[in-house]
């Protein structure tokens, strides 16, 4: 189950880890889209809207859980790299205890707050009942969502990115089958979508537990490993909390930009919504670089191979830049064709083409800043990742989108460029933070 990634070709290690991770992200994106696609076949606009709004709320919660779980991936990776198996076992046990106990509390709090949440997201009156039902079922299933994500984070900390890919594939297939059962055959509407989502993750968790029990690994868990240990919990949370806050803040910024677009009218609002979906697919590559650098970097830091960590960062940036440059150039020529499959309205196509021609450069810069974020997380400096993202959002991304919308009402191109400028600003902060971190490391070595 564990895979040592501290020797051999750096590029080969990156590809070995990142490709399954990329496929996992892709499957997870399909998983999220399945509910909307299937309910649209059997239900009306109100039910589709309910699932759309509810899934956005659940996406934000899931993203924050995944961010917090980054602390587990990094700390376990360091222990594996240092070949400290007792420490790895203690970190795995404490991860399970922390997240599962926390998920039960979170589920109870969310169920209690379901009505205010439905109001906050401005749910249309016709979709309130469906959204409320969808969210209650999903909130009750938060422990299942948490269990899947901590399983994935533990496996990745052990250097195994393939198993989580298989688990999400099982969840995706189960979700589609259950959606057709609950929404198609049983006509349960939004409740059926929520049940399909929750139960499919439960199936995936059960299968992952069976795999863990059957596989032989050098890491052996005992009851004592699940007993909360202050140092282990502190290590996990010190890395995970800044990432969780950062990811939550990013989701809020997307919501703000959506609100800005909504004020421009229906055509621009639709165009921005479509382009956001397209960009989310293209961002799978930069996102996989973040997770790859953090997991591989953590193992090599544990093994004391700091030069190899820098090489991992360089290769990841190179991969991100190459991919970003290819898609950025290509989209300039095929922008309308990229948008057209999502709408038959030619005005929306033209607006979307304008927006994506600017926004696509964010994909180029994101490959760099995401790689730096993974590097900082691997060194336990996730606060630096939170810092550059927060500064980017507050100083460039959101103000830039607002000003672009105000001064360029006839085109969405400047609004798209505002997002790219935000990532470019992040890179500048990352470079400064990187050199500061290297000086800190040299000072420690000299001492």
Which residues does each predicted region cover?
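Small-residue-rich hydrophobic transmembrane alpha-helices
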Residues: 48-108, 145-164, 258, 271-335, ...
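Short alpha-helical transmembrane segments in multi-pass integral membrane proteins
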Residues: 1-18, 76-143, 185-241, 297-362, ...
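Short runs within selected transmembrane alpha-helices of multi-pass transporters and secretion channels
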Residues: 69, 137-156, 164-172, 193-208, ...
């Amino acid at each position: 189950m564990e895979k040592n990634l501290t020797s051999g070709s750096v590029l080969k290690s990156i590809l070995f880890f990142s490709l399954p991770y990329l496929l996992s992200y892709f499957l997870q994106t399909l998983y999220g889209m399945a509910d909307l696609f299937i309910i649209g076949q059997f239900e009306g606009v109100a039910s589709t809207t309910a699932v759309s709004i509810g899934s956005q709320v659940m996406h934000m919660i899931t993203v924050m859980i995944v961010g917090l779980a980054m602390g587990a991936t990094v700390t376990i990776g360091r222990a594996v790299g240092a070949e400290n198996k007792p420490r790895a076992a203690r970190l795995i046990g404490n991860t399970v205890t922390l997240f599962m106990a926390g998920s039960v509390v979170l589920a109870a709090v969310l169920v209690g707050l379901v009505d205010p949440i439905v109001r906050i997201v401005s749910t249309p009156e016709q979709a309130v009942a469906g959204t409320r039902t969808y969210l209650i079922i999903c909130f009750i299933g938060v422990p299942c969502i948490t269990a899947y994500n901590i399983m994935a984070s533990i496996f990745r900390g052990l250097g195994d990115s393939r198993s989580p890919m298989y688990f999400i594939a099982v969840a995706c297939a189960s979700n589609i089958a259950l959606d057709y059962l609950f929404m198609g055959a049983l006509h349960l509407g939004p409740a059926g979508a929520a049940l399909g989502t929750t139960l499919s993750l439960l199936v995936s968790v059960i299968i992952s537990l069976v795999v863990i029990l059957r596989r032989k690994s050098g890491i052996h868990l005992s009851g004592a490993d699940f007993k909360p240990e202050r140092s282990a919990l502190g290590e996990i949370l010190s890395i995970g909390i800044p990432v969780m806050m950062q990811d939550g803040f990013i989701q809020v910024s997307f919501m703000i930009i959506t609100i800005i677009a909504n004020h421009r009218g229906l055509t621009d609002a639709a165009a921005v919504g479509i382009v956001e979906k397209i960009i989310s697919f293209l961002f799978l590559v930069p996102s996989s670089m973040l997770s790859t650098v953090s997991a591989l970097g953590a193992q090599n830091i544990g093994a004391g191979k700091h030069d190899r960590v820098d090489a991992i960062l360089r290769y990841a940036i190179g991969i991100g830049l190459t991919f970003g440059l290819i898609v950025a150039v290509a989209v300039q020529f095929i922008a309308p064709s990229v948008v057209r499959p999502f709408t038959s309205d030619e005005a929306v196509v033209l607006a979307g083409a304008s927006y994506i021609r600017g926004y696509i450069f964010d994909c180029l810069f994101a490959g760099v800043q995401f790689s730096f974020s993974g590097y900082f997380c691997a060194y336990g400096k996730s606060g630096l990742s939170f810092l550059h993202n927060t500064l980017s959002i507050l100083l460039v991304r959101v103000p830039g989108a607002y000003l672009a919308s105000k001064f360029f009402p006839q085109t969405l191109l400047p609004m798209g460029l505002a997002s790219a400028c935000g990532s470019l600003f992040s890179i500048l902060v990352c470079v400064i933070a990187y050199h500061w971190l290297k000086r800190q490391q040299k000072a420690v070595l000299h001492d």
